[in-house]
Amino acid sequence: MKPRCWLCGLLAALCAGCGGGDAVPVVEFYGDSLTFGSIEGPAGALTRLDVPPVRRAQELLGDAAVCVDMSLPGATVRDALDGVAMMPFGRFAEHVAATSASVMVIRYGGADAVRGTPLADFERGLAAMVGLAKSVGKRVLLVGVIATTTGVTDDYDLIVERVADAHGTDFVDVRAVPVALPDDLADAVHPAQAWSDRITAAIVRHLQAMTKP
């Protein structure tokens, strides 16, 4: 396990073994800067929301689940599959076969759009991630891609929904979450805290249904 995640993994293991009842479900969050909670800070420096999405999800879920952040700012689906440098979990296929997490929240597409990943490649890669997770018994929650003022993410959002339909996975339609552009943006492409929190709340509503006893 990479250094960044060892504490989360230890916490997950400890919590899963507590209480003598059913194990607390572990939920892993995969994604780019939208999951990490990145925003542009002073002089263009990258900083982070006061309460990043995965931390907010943990607050909302309480002791009903353990949330583990597996995101990497700027990461694409292909980066996750290949396990590029600094990826918290290495190659996805190897990690998903070994992790104790039962639910995978997969939220890619923002960085793919900005970096110009061909749509067909994005769809194949996302479908591969879902297939790998489902093949080892994981439940998958796919999260759509937020709108921007330029529309660059629109086709990627449609692909996420299409992959969810094709694989029968749960899907969070982030575009149904109330937003006022550009006021709810922290910078050109990242949600400010209030919008991020509303999106996370929508994700958590799905997770509550997926993880309830």
Segments from the language model and where they lie:
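Sec-dependent bacterial lipoprotein signal peptides
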Residues: 1-16
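Conserved Rossmann-like nucleotide-binding pocket used by diverse enzymes
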Residues: 14, 68, 141
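Serine-esterase "nucleophile elbow" of acetyl-processing enzymes
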Residues: 18-71, 94-98
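Acidic/histidine-rich helix-loop elements
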Residues: 38-49, 69-87, 114, 188
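Alpha-helical cap/lid subdomain in secreted, periplasmic
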Residues: 55, 86-213
